[in-house]
Curated annotation (Swiss-Prot):
Quaternary context: Homodimer.
The organism of origin for this protein: Thermosipho africanus (strain TCF52B)
Family stated for the protein in its record: Belongs to the type III pantothenate kinase family.
Domain of life the protein comes from: Bacteria
Protein keywords: ATP-binding, Coenzyme A biosynthesis, Cytoplasm, Kinase, Metal-binding, Nucleotide-binding, Potassium, Transferase
Gene designation per UniProt: coaX
GO MF entries: ATP binding; metal ion binding; pantothenate kinase activity
Binding site for K(+): D123
Annotated protein name in UniProt: Type III pantothenate kinase
Subcellular location: Cytoplasm
UniProt-annotated catalytic positions: D103
Length: 249
């Protein structure tokens, strides 16, 4: 069994898998586990200690040592960390491939393996990323503030606007300050994504490319999805598995 970690800025997804198709998933706050010993105690509650390897996709480099120490101390193994430069089945057509976030790398890998050589991926996390895959070449992407980042910016940058909890709305105009913020944030982000995708389709001749939405925050906008959009919450986990498959061969 492989032990996979998808370490995000806010939450970490932990998954156990044998084949990269089905996953036994747990989720924790990223900064709730501070040491390799705490990680061991947490995992022991749910999993047997029979891991073939440990593979980590992390966008929080200052806690990577926890996974390194855990693998060495409790598994007598070296943790494997996702990076674009280690994966050779995709051409990383950007200035500095080593700077591509691991979360983006695994999204692109899984999109390529599961949906074809052309794809557009939108990952709704703390920040929202849009990835462009053209003929199995990663052409780059876009990063925009996530839902909660925009809410927090309004709250911290003004004297009176409240911090609200986001939820879908069936109207485009709010009747109170809270609904004004909710509608404004969600519609601004969705409108920006729609515009960006249309430009990408036109500029890169990707009019028939599949569009995949993923990431924990995508649940907020699931009911707004157009019929041609694919909703795939396990895209990143499969990407981690495919990365391991590639480098283990």
């Amino acid at each position: 069994m492989l032990l996979l970690f998808d370490v995000g800025n806010t939450h970490t997804t932990i998954a156990l898998t044998k084949d990269g198709k089905s996953f036994d998933i747990k989720r924790v706050s990223t900064h709730s586990i501070q040491t390799e010993d705490e990680l061991y105690v947490f995992l022991k509650m749910f999993y047997r200690n029979d891991f073939k390897d440990i593979v980590v996709s992390s966008v929080v480099p200052n806690i990577n040592y926890i996974f390194e120490f855990f693998a060495e101390k409790y598994l007598n193994k070296k943790a494997i960390f996702v990076s674009a430069k280690e994966y050779n089945e995709i051409i990383w057509n950007v200035n500095t491939p080593e700077e591509i976030g691991a979360d983006r790398v695994v999204d692109v890998i899984a999109a390529s393996r599961d949906y074809g050589k052309d794809a557009i991926v939108v990952d709704f996390g703390t920040a929202i990323t849009i990835e462009v895959l053209k003929e199995n070449r990663y052409e780059g992407g876009v990063i925009i503030p996530g839902f909660n980042m925009m809410v927090n910016a309004l709250f911290k940058g003004t004297a009176k606007l409240p911090k609200v909890e986001l939820k879908p709305s069936d109207t485009f105009v709010g009747k109170d300050t809270g609904s004004n913020i909710r509608i404004g944030v969600i519609n601004t982000i969705l409108g920006g994504i729609d515009y960006t995708i249309e430009r990408i389709k036109s500029d890169y001749d990707l009019k028939s490319a599949p569009i995949i939405y993923t990431g924990g925050q995508s649940k907020l906008i699931r009911e707004y999805l157009k019929k041609d959009i694919i909703y795939d919450l396990e895209l990143g986990l499969r990407g981690i598995y495919y990365f391991y498959e590639n480098i283990a061969c």
